[in-house]
């Protein structure tokens, strides 16, 4: 998969929801006009000022999933463009966590940025519509093995939906589904020996079976988009594969919405392919923090402000 390997032993990874903060990228934007220019392109596609929302909006506004998703996509693409402008080395591979997979596909030239912005806004709206507010939930299960978590979910469902949805690292798995079933499963995980079962402050139970109706509608929108061949291999969440055909990439994005994010396996796959370090292209450092827990020989660093950018270049 990796062409000129001596040059590129690093991969870029792109974060998903939960990494957004009001005021993100302000420092980088102060020194690089390309950041606000990127957000202006996104704003034109959306019909509202996304940069103003990100810089001056409320946490509540930014955390609405149909606004979070375009904001994070624009942030990651802006950082990637600044990296390119500064002559940064090109990565061997890309991967993104959930929404971050869209950022990776834009940076790999698969989907046009303005179309991707509208697409992830729609993805957020469809996700929110699929589950009435207050009826879905997610919990992070800390310190329990995957098999025990899956068993706790199966035994707690009682005709409702609850399943593991993010395999973030060994000992850190997120479950999602109907609120009551998630509460039962969280309690069952604790009874089985989990250190913690932490309710997450989200309104949408992502990547579980409740998202299937949203995925069916997303598929219709994806059919209308032009997909180009990727310039870098992009490891997808749902199959831990690098697809090149439009049809296969579309299918993976549709299935991603109601299937687990296999992040642990994505990082292991990149390491097996010879990647030795990860750069996290986006706000925050969630993925950087997970890296060593997955493959302890990998190094990782975030790139999102002038200091981290110059350190990585």
What residue ranges belong to the model's regions?
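FabD-like malonyl-/acyl-CoA
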Residues: 5-149, 200, 277-311
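A short, acidic, amphipathic alpha-helical segment used as a generic capping/interface helix at domain edges
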Residues: 259-275
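Alpha/beta catalytic cores of group-transfer enzymes, especially the acyltransferase/condensing modules
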Residues: 17-19, 44-48, 108-259
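Non-catalytic positions within long, well-ordered alpha-helices that form the structural scaffold/packing
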Residues: 84, 190, 271-274
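Short amphipathic alpha-helix with an adjacent loop that forms part of the alpha/beta core around
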Residues: 156, 311-313
């Amino acid at each position: 998969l990796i062409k000129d390997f001596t040059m590129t032993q690093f991969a870029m990874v792109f974060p998903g929801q939960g990494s957004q903060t009001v005021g993100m990228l302000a420092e980088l934007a102060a020194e690089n006009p390309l950041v606000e220019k990127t957000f202006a392109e996104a704003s034109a596609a959306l019909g509202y000022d996304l940069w103003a929302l990100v810089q001056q909006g409320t946490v509540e506004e930014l955390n609405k999933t149909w606004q979070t998703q375009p904001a994070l996509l624009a942030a990651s693409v802006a950082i990637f463009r600044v990296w390119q402008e500064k002559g940064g080395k090109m990565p061997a591979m890309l991967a993104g966590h959930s929404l971050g997979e869209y950022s990776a596909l834009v940076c790999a030239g698969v989907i046009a940025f303005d179309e991707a912005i509208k697409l992830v806004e729609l993805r957020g709206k469809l996700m929110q519509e699929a589950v009435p507010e207050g009826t879905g939930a997610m919990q992070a299960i800390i310190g329990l093995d995957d098999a025990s978590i899956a068993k706790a979910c199966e035994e707690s469902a009682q005709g409702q939906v609850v399943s593991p949805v993010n395999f973030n690292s060994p000992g850190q798995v997120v479950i999602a589904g109907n609120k009551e079933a998630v509460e039962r499963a969280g309690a069952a995980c604790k009874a089985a020996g989990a250190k913690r079962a932490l309710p997450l402050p989200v309104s949408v139970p992502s990547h579980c079976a409740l998202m299937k109706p949203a995925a069916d509608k997303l598929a219709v929108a994806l059919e209308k988009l032009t997909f180009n061949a990727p310039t870098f291999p992009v490891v997808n969440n749902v199959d831990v594969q690098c697809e090149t055909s439009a049809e296969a990439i579309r299918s993976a994005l549709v299935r991603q919405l109601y299937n687990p994010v296999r992040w642990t396996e994505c990082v292991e796959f990149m390491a097996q392919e010879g990647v030795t370090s990860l750069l996290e292209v986006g706000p925050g450092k969630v993925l950087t923090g997970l890296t060593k827990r997955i493959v302890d020989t990998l190094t990782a660093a975030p790139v999102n402000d002038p200091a981290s950018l110059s350190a990585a270049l």
